[in-house]
Amino acid sequence: MNIRVSNGLKEFLWLLSDVRGGRILDLGPVWQATVNFLIEKHYRISTEDLLRSWKDFLTGEEERLRVTPVGDDGEKISQALLAQKFLETSLQYPEDQFHGVLAWDLFDYFDAELMPRVMERLYSVLHPGGAILALFHSRPPDRFHRYRIVDGQSIELLSAPTLAVHARVFQNREILDLFGKFRSSKTFVGRDQLREGLFLK
């Protein structure tokens, strides 16, 4: 098992500990271990595997373009338009719905058009005082991982079939710019090329 101590998770849970019946959005796949852990802590959890949804959406768009006769709107659709269209059916939640968001390493995989739009949406669905936990690779990872919670300060990295190509390595300044609307941030640097960022609305 590939388990790492997560100071970011520990602090994320501490920040949410005074919210009764807090709502958490997990942007990874459904893991029973994560669901059980959060339910035992009396949180309500919603899961939306955003990276898989994005991949499936792109595959569907490519197929649609492939079968569209040339001349019938056959030009290549822009990345901006794709991002906009994707978010018409994804991350559809009321404003201030969640007290915490587990974003994992999603931002490393999104393109420059989708990323700010996702960030804008997450900011709107996050309750004031709510927190986002995100992971950033300080170099391209050797393999694609998914993440699940083991306990209050540990996460397990699970090797998985590659869903998307690692798009970028963020510099610290870029991370702060991405989360510019948030009122505070804290970074935890691990020895395994993985940085954790905790961002408070």
Feature locations, PLM:
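Gly/Ser/Thr-rich loops at beta-strand to alpha-helix junctions
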Residues: 30-31, 108
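A short SAM/SAH-binding and catalytic strip from SAM-dependent methyltransferases
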Residues: 98-114
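Class I (Rossmann-like) S-adenosyl-L-methionine-dependent methyltransferase catalytic domain
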Residues: 1-25, 31-90, 131-201
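N-terminal cationic-hydrophobic initiation segments that often serve targeting/anchoring roles
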Residues: 16-17, 111, 123
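Residues at alpha-helix caps and immediate loop-helix transition turns in enzyme cores, especially N-
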Residues: 34, 114-115
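A short glycine-rich, Lys/Arg-flanked "PGG" loop and its adjoining helix->strand segment in the class I
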Residues: 116-131
